[in-house]
């Protein structure tokens, strides 16, 4: 029941016209930003990603927390960075690093339906490091692909701001209609 629900929720279908859609989207990333995006990844990026991790965040399949890596980084940092950089610079992640535990967290106190649960993925720290380095690298790209009027993916805005904007627009339209 859970597998069917989430498989359907997180899958896509009817990708027949994907190429046509992509063909009409203009390129908005300047070459200068693209050069930074495709340059080889560096150890400093891995170091920064680890420092940004919450020390006691949920562990992965191995039970390890970021605090272990942060505390012993002087001893293990070179080896860990070597693995992470190998994955990032080759574009491949070994299957052994890609194992994830999926846990369902109830959204409500008395959850009864499948839709009442939120899945979270518990990944290896190495996988999280790879993801964090990629996210940090792509932050420079966001101003070019996310509209300034959009609330999601904006560090200084909350999606809930849209409610206020919508209310103000409706109020303005009502005033124009009445006045």
Positions of predicted regions on the chain:
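Surface-exposed loop/turn segments and immediately adjacent short secondary-structure elements
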Residues: 1-115, 129
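Beta-strand elements of modular eukaryotic interaction domains
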Residues: 91-93, 111, 142, 172-175
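A short acidic-Thr-Gly-centered motif at the start of a beta-strand
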Residues: 107-110, 165-179
């Amino acid at each position: 029941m859970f597998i069917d629900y989430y498989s359907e929720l997180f899958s896509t279908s009817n990708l027949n016209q994907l190429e046509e859609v992509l063909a009409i989207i203009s390129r908005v990333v300047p070459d200068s930003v693209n050069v930074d995006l495709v340059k080889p990844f560096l150890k400093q990026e891995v170091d920064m990603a680890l420092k940004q991790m919450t020390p006691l965040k949920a562990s992965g399949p191995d039970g390890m927390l970021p605090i272990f890596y942060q505390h012993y980084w002087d001893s293990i940092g070179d080896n860990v960075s070597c693995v992470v950089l190998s994955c990032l610079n080759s574009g491949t992640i070994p299957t052994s690093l890609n194992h994830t535990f999926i846990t369902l967290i109830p959204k409500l106190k008395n959850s009864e339906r499948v839709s009442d649960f939120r899945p979270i993925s518990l990944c290896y720290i190495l996988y999280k490091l790879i993801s964090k380095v990629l996210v940090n690298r792509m932050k420079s790209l966001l101003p070019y692909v996310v509209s300034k009027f959009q609330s999601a993916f904006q560090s200084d805005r909350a999606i809930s701001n849209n409610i206020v904007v919508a209310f103000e627009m409706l109020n303005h339209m009502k005033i124009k209609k009445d006045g």
